[in-house]
Amino acid sequence: MNDLLPDLCDHYEQDVRWLPLVLNDYGGKKIFYGEVVTLRCFEDNSLVRDIVSQDGTGKVLFIDGHASYNGALLGDQLALLAVKNGWQGIVINGTARDVGTLATLDLGVKALGTCPYKTVKRQTGDMNVTMTVAHTMIYPGDYLYADLNGILLSKQSLDLSVL
């Protein structure tokens, strides 16, 4: 299957929310889904390391970086750590770096763009909070479905076997 979202929209139209945000695909995994873990941070990715160091089996990290282009919230080292710990994907309302390497990893990565600079490390940010991105509410525990068509969110896990 190359396109998941159109089929989900056709079958679960009343159960999904579209995230109207144009993101670039940088990871090696083009279709990914899982339970959402949220992080709100601004130009500081130290909490990203804390989160991807934990078991991420069946989970997707959604980072609201306030659309800043001043420092990458994800690079190759954190992405490798995420893969090692079973994360399905990382979505960034902000930037990533080392995208040549990210493209080789078994991890979904979507971001606004790239920035070659690293962020500062102040241990600031808010984990597992409700966020608003592109006029869309994103809740910890939501389920996120992503492919090259974009991102859908749902309050519950969707049965993909019906597609």
UniProtKB/Swiss-Prot annotation:
Catalyzes the aldol cleavage of 4-hydroxy-4-methyl-2-oxoglutarate (HMG) into 2 molecules of pyruvate. Also contains a secondary oxaloacetate (OAA) decarboxylase activity due to the common pyruvate enolate transition state formed following C-C bond cleavage in the retro-aldol and decarboxylation reactions. Homotrimer. GO terms for molecular function: 4-hydroxy-4-methyl-2-oxoglutarate aldolase activity; metal ion binding; oxaloacetate decarboxylase activity; ribonuclease inhibitor activity. This is Putative 4-hydroxy-4-methyl-2-oxoglutarate aldolase. Keywords: Lyase, Metal-binding. Belongs to the class II aldolase/RraA-like family. It catalyses: 4-hydroxy-4-methyl-2-oxoglutarate = 2 pyruvate; oxaloacetate + H(+) = pyruvate + CO2. It comes from the Bacteria. Its EC number is 4.1.3.17, 4.1.1.112. Divalent metal cation. A divalent metal cation binds at D98. Pfam families: RraA-like (PF03737). GO terms for biological process: regulation of RNA metabolic process. Substrate binds at G75, D76, Q77, L78, R97.
